Amino acid sequence: MLEEKLLKKIKTINENFINLGFDLEEDLIELVTQREDIRDRIENTKYKKMTFSKDEEANSYILNLEDCQISFDIIEGEDGEGPWFEVECNIIFF
């Protein structure tokens, strides 16, 4: 279980993504659960130093931390059951 402080930060981060057009809360929680290094970076980066953007062409939602960029690429499609989407997360360190 994630700490309440981290969950609040994830909700705040997600509000930015919602404002850009997509709810990524579940994907953010999954990411910090699977990647301790990313969890530590999110916990230790001040919110004011984070930046958020959307790449319309690639349908990606981007979170920039001080030393890495996390992009959530949205893949959409439709099949016999109707529309679907998948989120792919990519991390670049600099």
Protein language model annotation of sequence segments:
Residues M1-I38:
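N-terminal trafficking/processing presequences and adjacent post-cleavage segments
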Residues E26-F93:
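Acidic, low-complexity, intrinsically disordered interaction modules
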